[in-house]
Amino acid sequence: RAKTIYVKSAEEMHRVSIREAAKCQLFIACAAVADYRPKQKLTKKVKKDSDFMDISLIKNPDIASDVSALCNKPFTVGFAAETQESNESLEKIAFEKLQRKKLDLIIANDISNGSIGFDSDYNSVVAIDEYSSEIFPRVRKTQLSRQLISKISQKIKIKNKEL
């Protein structure tokens, strides 16, 4: 059963995710949480006193990594929206992220491809676990979501047999 909880900040999302993940069999980290937040929270309007403003940023907690680090962790799925800025393949970048965050499965896509991903009804992704990868060619996002749920279900069944 899916559960939606509304939050207002990455920090609140982190707290709620850790609390709720401890009760789950599956945690899908699909929110595009900002990597950084302003160091200082302001409660008043910032005056336009000069032409420039410096804003200090600090790193937000990594929700997927922290869920994966739980003692009794759920099957944890992460997402990686990547841009191809180097010769490194999407699969290699995503696999490194899978290992670093200790995820069970990662779903990655190349957001520099304008015909898929953001601002498109279509997407193409690669699903990667510790032992294999599977490319999901360009289809409507609604169809892709069904394919990914099926893939995740298969992976959970395999993991449960191993236990």
Locations of regions flagged by a protein language model:
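A cross-family phosphate/adenosyl-ligand binding-site feature
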Residues: 1-163
